């Protein structure tokens, strides 16, 4: 989604460029509870059916330095270590048993590009690497990660002087359900959790899709020792490549648009551009591609929307066209009725109809009411209601996050 990408990109830029005095454990920077940031009561509830649940709140402070919030609401700036993969101190927040009273934490300062994490049964392991600004090593979706066998999930947020913006996302994975609610100047807002049974249904659907087309969809399903589903990863985190999966679809697209014009509206005042296939690229008249033509993308390019011809490079217009083309590839919406007019020509009912499509995203949308399933899932017909699963308030007075399917 646009807002989610913006907040994460801004947080990343701040981390990369912040110039901060060396950390001293005796410095008041070790833990900050500044009056400059408005206090925000946060309610962490366990409705998961599991009695041992830990929460974590991580992000950066307003200067871009990584922080963890402890149970007392204080922002703890991480020391800059001397060696790589240094374990981070335990900032876990123990929640009560499932169905018990919520645990209350009051944020005492702003947190940028943050996450609220939950883990079931055991604590998560976080690490930090040295640098001009230390880099946090978060739980990763690879089997060598020490948190691989732990059941965990997260939601994303930024809390700054402008607003609280928080969202759930399935861009990386589907796991334990999380719901949210807030109060403030924007009224009462809520975000629904993943419905009961959705995780198992998505896993089953991916296994069935593998049986149907032979692509490695089943490798996206992660189970524990008993065979229970822990999480379903998006194709960007697949342990094996999808190789030539998209080749047939791309061949048909390139053949079709060799003689049929493709018009893409960049929306937001960008304007529309029309192009046809010329050689191995779709060439849009009047569009500056910044030296990166729209050639045939790879499977990695399509699923990740962040490499090759779909990398959001150059001027705003090229980035907007790349985003809408990436969405059309993932949804298989270029060859359906109206597909030559993106994104307005195809309603959501026309998405994922081609046998070659992003079946992870298809199944997420089949079983989840809200939440994005790939990076440009915010692209849609002009005026369409967003389904990103976010809340936003310029003057929040409370924020609740619940682990479990029965939530807000």
Predicted regions and their residues:
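N-terminal export signals
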Residues: 6-26
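Compositionally biased regions
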Residues: 25-28, 71
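Boundary at the C-terminal end of the N-terminal hydrophobic targeting segment
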Residues: 30-35
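Extracellular low-complexity, O-glycosylation-prone Ser/Thr/Pro/Gly-rich "stalks"
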Residues: 36-408
